[in-house]
């Protein structure tokens, strides 16, 4: 069956996990998030295979960077482009938000299907682990920034506009933080399941079993930050290394910003992938 030429396909991926050695303070020139993102992009270009690497890099319509918590870069997309050796037609930065990476993939796929772009490089990363170690050791990190006047003269696009993270009802009640909001969601789910005959303890055990399965996958993933399989009981039992964060979520059930990691995707139209000679066995349909 022929593939529609405007079908979006992922043709390359790259991941970087940097684990700081020992407990010594980090050096001032420790790799920052944009350095890790650039490395992930190079890996993704290589992953695309064959001679397509250079051709893809020279034909990037959009470089989109998920905004970081680790550092205020001004324009992280500009820095990543320079470090990765890309000259994208458009530089895009997302607003803050945990949903931004997946939403960025979705919107990119729609733009490709609509014929608006042909090749996009998506990336994101954090070096919060190094940032916090440096702060504790009073080390001033020599990480890059784009000056305000440079940003003003040539600003990146802001993908999708700033997100509204709270409803007016939540704001009126002082509910702002994820640690407040997600337990409320969980309470609503438990209430609904309770009406269906599932008691809260059974529900929590089922959720913990799902998390235990996630940890099994992480245990065999060389890029996972916490590659250790946990039992369901370990997941839900509070302790010295697994404190209760927001009932019923313990620490291991929460997202973790305290990492040095990055990832990148190359997404393009099927037509462009064929023209660039990317082997079909490298295509993944998002």
What are these regions (language model features)?
Residues 100-103, 115-121:
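Elongated alpha-helical scaffolds
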Residues 1-93, 110-117, 124-272, 276-286:
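Conserved "HGTGT" condensation-loop signature of ketosynthase/thiolase-family condensing enzymes
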Residues 102-110:
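Conserved phosphate-binding catalytic cores of ATP/NTP-utilizing and phosphoryl-transfer enzymes
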């Amino acid at each position: 069956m022929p593939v529609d030429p405007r079908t979006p396909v992922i043709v390359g991926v790259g991941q970087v996990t940097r684990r700081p050695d020992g407990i010594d303070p980090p050096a001032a020139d420790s790799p920052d998030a944009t350095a890790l993102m650039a490395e992930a992009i190079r890996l993704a270009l290589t992953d695309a295979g064959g001679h397509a690497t250079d051709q893809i890099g020279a034909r990037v319509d959009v470089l989109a960077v998920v905004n970081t918590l680790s550092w205020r870069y001004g324009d992280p997309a500009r820095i990543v482009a320079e470090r990765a050796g890309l000259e994208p037609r458009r530089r895009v930065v997302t607003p803050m938000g945990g949903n931004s990476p997946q939403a960025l993939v979705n919107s990119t796929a729609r733009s490709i299907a609509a014929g608006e772009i042909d090749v996009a490089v998506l990336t994101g990363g954090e070096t919060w682990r190094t940032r916090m170690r440096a702060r504790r050791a009073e080390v001033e990190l020599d990480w890059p920034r784009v000056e305000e006047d440079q940003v003003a003269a040539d600003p990146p696009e802001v993908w999708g506009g700033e997100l509204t993270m709270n409803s007016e009802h939540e704001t009126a009640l002082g509910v702002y933080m994820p640690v407040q909001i997600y337990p409320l969601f969980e309470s609503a789910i438990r209430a609904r399941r309770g009406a269906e005959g599932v008691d809260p303890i059974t529900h929590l055990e089922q959720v913990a079993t799902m998390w235990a399965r996630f940890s099994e996958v992480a245990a065999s993933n060389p890029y996972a930050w916490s590659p250790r399989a946990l039992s369901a009981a370990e997941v839900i039992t509070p302790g010295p290394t697994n404190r209760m964060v927001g009932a019923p979520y313990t620490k291991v059930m929460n997202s973790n910003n305290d990492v040095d990691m990055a990832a990148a995707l190359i997404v393009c139209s099927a037509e462009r992938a064929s023209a660039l000679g990317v082997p079909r066995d490298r295509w993944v349909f998002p």
